[in-house]
């Protein structure tokens, strides 16, 4: 079998196509979930926490050079200038966003699973003794 035929079988058989469709739909779905978190959930959390913003929380690890022209209280300005700073606030913001995002996806999957029709249970396998008795019966009929 040629390499092209093998690749063709690999690409069109099995889960490769399912995976490709899943990745494409996942990319589109992630934009929806990102929008839900950023545009709907985070503003509510901002109101509940009094507008608290963790993204600019940091610990200065180095010294600010005398040529620095940005805001010394801005993590982004310090990063842009190459000043060493431990930006724990950005991590906290990303972690909170992740937890919220994961919870929203969990709720969506749970809702979608409720909408799905339950699969019918596969019929139980015939017990081995019944199969043996049928074989004996069939062999006796043939005599």
From Swiss-Prot:
InterPro entries: Mechanosensitive_channel_CS, MS_channel, MSC/AndL, MscL_channel. The keyword Cell membrane applies. The chain crosses the membrane at residues 10-30, 89-109. One of its GO terms (cellular component) is plasma membrane. It is found in: Cell inner membrane. It is a multi-pass membrane protein. One of its GO terms (molecular function) is mechanosensitive monoatomic ion channel activity. Belongs to the MscL family. Homopentamer. This is Large-conductance mechanosensitive channel. It comes from Burkholderia cenocepacia (strain ATCC BAA-245 / DSM 16553 / LMG 16656 / NCTC 13227 / J2315 / CF5610).
């Amino acid at each position: 079998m040629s390499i092209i035929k093998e690749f063709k079988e690999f690409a069109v058989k099995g889960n490769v196509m399912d995976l490709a469709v899943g990745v494409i739909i996942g990319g589109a779905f992630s934009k929806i979930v990102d929008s839900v978190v950023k545009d709907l959930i985070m503003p509510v959390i901002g109101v509940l926490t009094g507008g608290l913003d963790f993204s600019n929380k940091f610990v200065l690890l180095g010294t600010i050079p005398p040529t620095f022209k940005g805001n010394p209280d801005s993590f982004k300005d310090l990063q842009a200038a190459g000043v060493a700073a431990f930006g724990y606030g950005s991590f906290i913001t990303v972690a909170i966003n992740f937890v919220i995002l994961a919870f929203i996806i969990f709720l969506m999957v749970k809702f979608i699973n409720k909408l799905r029709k339950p699969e019918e249970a596969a019929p139980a396998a015939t017990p081995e003794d019944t199969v043996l008795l049928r074989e004996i019966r069939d062999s006796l009929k043939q005599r």
